[in-house]
Amino acid sequence: MTRVASTSAMNLAKKLAEAGIRHPAVLHAVATTPRELFLDGALAHKAYENTALPIGQGQTISQPYIVARMTELLLQHNPQKVLEIGTGSGYQAAVLASLIPELFTIERIKALQIQARQRLKRLDLHNVAFKYGDGWQGWSNRGPFDGIMVTAAAATVPQALLEQLSEHGVLIIPVGEDTQQLLKITRIGQTFQSEIIEAVKFVPLINGDLA
């Protein structure tokens, strides 16, 4: 299907540009991704507010600014193959899938994964592979990945995700518990260069348990 920018989505993209998002492709993706599709009907009227919102199961759809910021950080490295940890509502996956050739996404809550798959199908996004599983372990038999994006905060950086980065691959991950920082970690051979981007607040990345 052809994705047409609604006035509300265009206004949101404009606000994100004013907040510092510069990549035109990211702004276009936000403007043409119907965020209301990823929310319960009772919250649809809040879809284009720049705020995180509940999606059930104790999870949230991320603030549009942070979706755009994390996507922009990835696109700086022109990734062709990306792993997303934490499919959630599917909104971040929809933005990513419109910008990169191959997306792999993992969700530990089955009900959310089913809904996200249906939503991306409605948007005619067919370059996405879904997995129900423990995101802490990544998806080793589909790696390595040029980029990995984690949409929940890990207490520490999962070693498995570092190992699944390709050479010069980039991991975008929020790390911390009470205080969280968004990190950009770049693989150079067997070493990893870490850069603090900004303070953030995410739900925790759960290690092991599936729901």
UniProtKB/Swiss-Prot annotation:
Pfam families found in the cross-reference section: PCMT (PF01135)
Active site as annotated: S62
Reactions performed catalytically: [protein]-L-isoaspartate + S-adenosyl-L-methionine = [protein]-L-isoaspartate alpha-methyl ester + S-adenosyl-L-homocysteine
PROSITE patterns linked: PCMT
A single MF term (Gene Ontology): protein-L-isoaspartate (D-aspartate) O-methyltransferase activity
Enzyme Commission number, as recorded: 2.1.1.77
InterPro entries: PCMT, SAM-dependent_MTases_sf
Top EC group: transferase
SUPFAM superfamilies reported in the protein's UniProt record: S-adenosyl-L-methionine-dependent methyltransferases
One example of a Gene Ontology biological process annotation: protein repair
One GO term describing the cellular component: cytoplasm
Subcellular location: Cytoplasm
Coiled coil (residue ranges): none
Keywords recorded for this protein, A-Z: Cytoplasm, Methyltransferase, S-adenosyl-L-methionine, Transferase
UniProt KW Amino-acid biosynthesis keyword: no
Top-level taxon: Bacteria
Function summary: Catalyzes the methyl esterification of L-isoaspartyl residues in peptides and proteins that result from spontaneous decomposition of normal L-aspartyl and L-asparaginyl residues. It plays a role in the repair and/or degradation of damaged proteins.
Family: Belongs to the methyltransferase superfamily. L-isoaspartyl/D-aspartyl protein methyltransferase family.
Protein name: Protein-L-isoaspartate O-methyltransferase
Native source species: Shewanella frigidimarina (strain NCIMB 400)
Gene: pcm
